[in-house]
């Protein structure tokens, strides 16, 4: 009986497929000492990048399972290290036996996102690409998946690298002027440095606009439905969801708690929250529901105030509007089928029927407009809030550089800060705490 191999801190293993039962399950191992582990569990080291059908063996040499082994020799692997993938039957017990055998042979259980983190540290992916791995897995729509794949292929990073390169060239001109102050040549004027700075600022704004679309695809928009009881909030939720997500009756106050449903409009996730009708009541349960309604409003991106189209906005609705926080507000005149109105929309009002569906497409368009959504197109890429923050800081430093352009030391420093902000996106400059936060949100097998 073979003795267990000593633990190897640099050898990691994890189940790479989703929990539960399936036809195939994958255990992934990565690290410099994959070879001895492969020999112990397979009886041989498979030929790199070839499919090998074999048995997976326990300590006594008895089979745990049989399946396919794939060996990728460094640096030609996802992590840049030696990688072994064991593809067996997808039952949780079988996969656990294979994983435990790997741990017995000296591997340790991988931390969340550790495979992707190693790929980043070994230069196989930059940080934006590594994040796109998780975004592709979590994509809730075809548009989100396509955008994540573009980021994974490096389109977003290429835009950032281009901006960084332009800043580096501009910084070189400034440094040359500082290093040769007595020369008659004005490097900055000859190279149109200030025109180039303006062009960089325009490019940063364009990239930020695209990144904002990616954030919308990833995070979506939270929309809360508010109004008096029995104005059709639950009916509108059901119409948007396409099924009966909330109970609808003629009895006022049927909805006592918030009801949440996720929908998609042109691939953008919209989180719709139905709330209890806002009114004065002595019912303690309804009071609790109304309190939760206001909590939902505080966290929303858009508040839809529903009113009966036959009555319009009255004193009570005006009070609700006055209490709404600083969010996008749209007044929805529901029940136009009863009031005899036609579907239409103005800047901040919509006339529709949740019951018949008339005018609901106008609402969908308004929600996308409120989100700032533009047609994704072929150039859209996935992005995160931290990317927007970095682009905002870069834009501010570029603007400040223009304000201090004649003070060359300050000009150079603002350009450096803009470059550093952009470099955070791809991970060229990133604190360990940031890396831990990003990769810690990944699943274990990635």
UniProtKB/Swiss-Prot annotation:
Cofactor binding note: Binds 1 potassium ion per subunit.
Record-stated family: Belongs to the TRAFAC class TrmE-Era-EngA-EngB-Septin-like GTPase superfamily. TrmE GTPase family.
EC number assigned by the record: 3.6.-.-
Gene Ontology biological process terms, A to Z: tRNA methylation; tRNA wobble uridine modification
GO CC, alphabetical: cytosol
Cofactor(s) the record lists: K(+)
Location in or out of the cell: Cytoplasm
TrmE-type G domain ranges (all copies): 220-372
Residue positions binding (6S)-5-formyl-5,6,7,8-tetrahydrofolate: 28, 85, 124, 446
Record GO terms (molecular function): GTP binding; GTPase activity; metal ion binding
Species this chain originates from: Thiobacillus denitrificans (strain ATCC 25259 / T1)
Regions crossing the membrane: none
Any Pfam family hit: MMR_HSR1
UniProt-recorded name of the protein: tRNA modification GTPase MnmE
Any coiled-coil regions, as ranges: none
The protein's role, per its UniProt record: Exhibits a very high intrinsic GTPase hydrolysis rate. Involved in the addition of a carboxymethylaminomethyl (cmnm) group at the wobble position (U34) of certain tRNAs, forming tRNA-cmnm(5)s(2)U34.
Assembly with partners or alone: Homodimer. Heterotetramer of two MnmE and two MnmG subunits.
Gene this protein is translated from: mnmE
PROSITE patterns: G_TRME
Keyword set includes Cytoplasm: yes
UniProt-annotated binding residues for Mg(2+): 234, 255
Residues given in the record as K(+) binding sites: 230, 249, 251, 254
Highest taxon of source: Bacteria
């Amino acid at each position: 009986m073979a003795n267990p191999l000593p633990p190897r801190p640099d050898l990691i293993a994890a189940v790479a497929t989703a929990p539960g039962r399936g036809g195939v399950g994958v255990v992934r191992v990565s690290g410099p000492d994959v070879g001895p582990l492969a020999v112990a569990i397979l009886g041989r080291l498979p030929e790199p990048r070839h499919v090998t059908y074999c048995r997976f063996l326990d300590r006594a040499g008895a089979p745990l399972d049989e399946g396919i082994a794939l060996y990728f020799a460094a640096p030609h692997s996802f992590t840049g290290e030696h990688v072994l993938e064991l593809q067996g039957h997808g039952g949780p017990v079988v996969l656990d036996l294979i994983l435990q055998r790997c741990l017995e042979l000296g591997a340790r259980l991988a931390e969340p996102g550790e495979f992707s983190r190693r790929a980043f540290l070994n230069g196989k992916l930059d940080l934006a690409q590594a994040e796109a791995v998780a975004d592709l897995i979590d994509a809730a729509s075809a548009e989100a998946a396509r955008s994540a794949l573009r980021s994974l292929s490096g389109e977003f990073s290429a835009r950032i690298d281009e901006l960084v390169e332009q800043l580096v060239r501009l910084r070189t001109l400034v440094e040359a002027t500082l290093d040769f102050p007595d020369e008659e040549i004005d490097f900055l004027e000859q190279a149109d440095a200030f025109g180039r700075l303006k062009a960089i600022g325009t490019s940063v704004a364009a990239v930020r606009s695209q990144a904002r679309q990616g954030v919308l695809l990833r995070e979506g928009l939270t929309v809360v439905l508010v109004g008096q009881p029995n104005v059709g909030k639950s009916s509108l939720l059901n119409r948007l969801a396409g099924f009966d997500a909330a109970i609808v009756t003629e009895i006022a106050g049927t909805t006592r708690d918030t009801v949440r449903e996720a929908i998609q409009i042109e691939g953008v996730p919209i989180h719709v929250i139905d709330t209890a009708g806002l009114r004065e009541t002595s019912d303690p349960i309804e009071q609790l529901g109304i309190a939760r309604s206001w909590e939902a409003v505080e966290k929303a991106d858009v508040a839809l105030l529903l009113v009966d189209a036959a009555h319009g906005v009255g004193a009570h609705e005006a009070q609700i509007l006055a209490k709404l926080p600083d969010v996008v507000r749209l007044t929805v005149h529901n029940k136009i089928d009863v009031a005899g109105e036609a579907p239409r929309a103005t800047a901040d009002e919509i006339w529709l029927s949740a019951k018949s569906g008339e005018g609901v497409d106008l609402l969908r368009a308004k929600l996308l407009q409120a989100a700032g959504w533009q047609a994704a197109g072929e150039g859209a890429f996935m992005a995160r809030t931290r990317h927007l923050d970095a682009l905002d800081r870069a834009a501010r430093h570029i603007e400040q550089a223009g304000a201090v352009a004649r003070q060359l030391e300050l000009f150079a420093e603002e350009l450096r800060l803009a470059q550093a902000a952009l470099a955070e996106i791809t991970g060229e400059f990133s604190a360990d705490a940031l890396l831990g936060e990003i990769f810690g949100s990944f699943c274990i097998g990635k």
